[in-house]
């Protein structure tokens, strides 16, 4: 099975390449539809795992939305299976409990709106694609730290105690994606860690010390925890919670 990973230099993308030495990760400007098609025609992958994104800054929305659509169209054109990475912040977190795959998106941030729009574009362009919603990605002890872990180690930072997420260890997520790539599965699937924790608790787990806490300001997502029970029923890979990852 020939696998191509977009965003291969990123935290998750590089983990995928380590797990599958034969996978390709050649860089392409995902906003350039012709360039994406040319790359896929040349590589002829069986599976495309689309992890490339930009959270903010110049061109972020175009990379997230148009980029996802271009990747989906190019994957369909060469007959490749598409696994598209999405996020828990397609929700505003005001439901009051873990979100299921059937819950309608309700983003409250620009990034969340872009990712929700990307999901819709991918679903239309590639109806057989698997859209994986995940959460904050961490490395854990013995692994290169994620940006979330680097921030958590700053003693001057204050962390939100009412923004709840379901962080996942990067190796667990990468292994799960590879398993899912081989399954005949489409639509939405939550793939996140087993523990729902606040930003503040995550920082304390990472840093091993108490942190300064504060409520999230208006406009931030609140409890965006994900119910990943369906994924756990399908996977051999264990999606550990961060309390066990940092134990």
Question: Model-found features: residue ranges?
Answer:
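SDR active-site strand-loop-helix element
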Residues: 6, 48-52, 82-88, 132-134
